[in-house]
Each structure stands twice: as structure tokens, then as C-alpha cells.
């Protein structure tokens, strides 16, 4: 029995399902989840000391790679001053200033402790600001596990096959309108009928929780237009894309300015951090300035702030994202060529330091329906073949992959060669 198998058996006695987040349980691929002991650069090491090239990156935060010295040094220095005060600190201001500098649509920002908390708070703020109840989201997009947003959600909810989580009251879910991602005409119809009742649209500008789906031409522009016409708030959930697909996030990459933005993952460098912010006139409705309540004991935690600030300073260096994107392109083009040579139907996509792949005959995967048509059995087999080769992709077909600064050309070349061997086994 491997150390991971032993730990998983032990974990299931005290932790529901043996994990603290469902996608970690390997339900999407089968088998025993791997328990990791440490990470360094582009690599993670399991409890049996086996090394893997890591393309999960803690689901996105590790844009510099694991255990980056700048981040660790910043955290060590802060530890000498204390862990938490529940009071204002200067580093919170510095962090807020940096975020607003990098994301110009954010006049003000509020720090929280997770992406879920950020999206939940942004929704509440939009409702309070507009005086409306209804919200629009898109099928297959995941915005955390708050009740309003678990209707037809992506990510782990897709893996579990639970489109609407038990425990979400029907009278609450009725205020959530779910439309098809990338369906421009459906958006227009919805807003022509009830636009004056809608508080906000929340959207992943790149849908990273049903793998990696890019917006079709005109989709994000349409969202901006209908919100302008109806008075609804446009929220970009950039928990995943923020600082990753471009320094200014997906909004900078696509040139669309939202009213509110939610952030997480990269902003915390692996620490539990989220944030939401946007137009001053909207943000001034948040307590203590306004009546919309939001609070958190550990919000703006100084250890998390210094870690996040270290990452933001590093990724602000000239050429960082160009290099990141080049690495991702090299990886997915190599995977695609390997699949084609093996005769395996395969579709790839990448944007900035984020990528996805699908086992499908389709040349483009653009909707939730497209994702559902992909060959999950081939993905599961490929995942385990690659794991045996020492390459760790996301253990679910509905999750995006991530490149870090630490990945080398040699890492990528090895991954492609391992994929060639793995594809050969699928034929």
C-alpha cells in the first residue's frame, strides 16, 4: 500500500470523503487521491517521495511555482511581527494600491479570505446597489459555493454530477437565472424581457471551471451592452483569470471593462485570499461607508498580504506574461501534435498562463453542451497514464491547467514525450 492510500483510508474516518474540497477526491478520474508532501518550483512530491511536473499549481495560485524565495522571504519577515491583529495594517493599503494599479477598473477594493467570499460579497453589493434581486450566471461557470451561485455550476459540481446542490432553497434559487455561456442571442432575449429586474451578470470571462472555454467574438461586448442599457452591474469573476491571462486579467486581455471584479488564487500566492472591487460609486455602498454589510475576522491578514504583494511585484516585471503565454502555447501545441500523430481526437486551447484540452472530434469547444460531448473515459485513462509518467494534470476533465514561471522547456518537452507514450496506449 502506498503512503497516499494509507493516508486516504485514515482521512475518511474524520474528513468527509477524506478531502476538504470535493475535486481532490479523484471522483473525476477514479483511484486514490495523491497526498503531497512538498512543492518546489514546477514540481510537487508525494508522500512516497515521487516527483511530478505540476500543471495544477494549487488550482491556479502558484504562478511563480512552488516555494518561490521572494514569497517565502516576505512571509518569514512578517512572522516576526505577528500573524493577525484584526485591525488595519499598512500592508493592506499597499496591497490595495497595487491591485488598483494593475486593474484600472477597480477604484476601490475590499480584501476577503477566498474567491467564494469575494463573489458572494460582490453579488450582495450588486443587489444592494441596484435594489434588485435577480442575478444572471452561465451554465457550467463556477463562482464558489454560496447558495445563489450553485445553480448549474461548474468545477467540482460538474464532476459530482450535481447541477443544483441539495441545501439550496428553491425560493433563493429562483432569483438565479442561468443562461448558456457564449449564447449572445439568449442574453439579449433575457434582458429584453426582464432586464429591469436584474441586479447583475456574473461571468468568468474565460470559463475555467468547465475546463478552459474562451468567449466567442461579441459575447463579452454583449454583456457590457445589456448591463449599460438595463442598469445591471457587470461582474467579472477573475478569481482564476486575474493576473494570469494578462497582468490586468481577462478584462485587459479582451478590452472589456466590468463594473465589479472578483479576485483570488494568484492574489494570495497560495494563502487564503480573495478580493472584490470596482467603481467607487458602487464600492461606497459597502459598510462602513454604506448599508451593504460585509465583514471578516481575518480579512486583510498581514501574512497573506505580504505573500500576495510579493507575487504581484514579481509578475509586474516586463515580459513576465509574454513568457508565460509562450510556455503554455508550446505545451498545448506539442500535446496537439502528439495526439494527431497517434490518431487521438484532441482539441486544445490556451490563453496567457492558462490552458485546457478536450478529447473530442470538435475543432472548437465553446459551450457547456460541447464540453459534455467530450470523451471522459479517454480523459480518465490519459490522466492516469500521465500520472505514471510523473506528470500531474488536474484530476477532472472540467478543470483548466496552469503554467508557472518555474516550468522549463525541458519540463514541457518531457511532458510532450510522456503524452506521446500515453496517447499510444489510448488507440
Curated annotation (Swiss-Prot):
* Stored HAMAP family: HemL_aminotrans_3
Source organism of this protein record:
Marinomonas sp. (strain MWYL1)
- In short, the EC number is 5.4.3.8
GO molecular function terms listed in the Swiss-Prot or TrEMBL record: glutamate-1-semialdehyde 2,1-aminomutase activity; pyridoxal phosphate binding; transaminase activity
Q: What is this protein called?
A: Glutamate-1-semialdehyde 2,1-aminomutase
Instruction: Please list the cofactors this protein needs.
Output: pyridoxal 5'-phosphate
What the record says about family reads: Belongs to the class-III pyridoxal-phosphate-dependent aminotransferase family. HemL subfamily.
How it assembles, according to the record, is: Homodimer.
Chief place of localization: cytoplasm
Instruction: Spell out which residues are annotated as carrying N6-(pyridoxal phosphate)lysine.
Output: 265
One cellular component GO annotation, for this chain's record? cytoplasm
Recorded hits in CDD domains, A to Z, give: OAT_like
UniProt pathway: Porphyrin-containing compound metabolism; protoporphyrin-IX biosynthesis; 5-aminolevulinate from L-glutamyl-tRNA(Glu): step 2/2
Could you give a single Gene Ontology term from the biological process aspect? Answer: protoporphyrinogen IX biosynthetic process
Instruction: Please list the reactions this protein catalyses.
Output: (S)-4-amino-5-oxopentanoate = 5-aminolevulinate
Enzyme class comes to isomerase
Name the keywords, alphabetized: Cytoplasm, Isomerase, Porphyrin biosynthesis, Pyridoxal phosphate
Q: Where in the cell is it found?
A: Cytoplasm
InterPro entries named in the record: 4pyrrol_synth_GluAld_NH2Trfase, Aminotrans_3, Aminotrans_3_PPA_site, PyrdxlP-dep_Trfase, PyrdxlP-dep_Trfase_major, PyrdxlP-dep_Trfase_small
Q: Name one Pfam family in it.
A: Aminotran_3
Q: Does the keyword Iron apply?
A: no
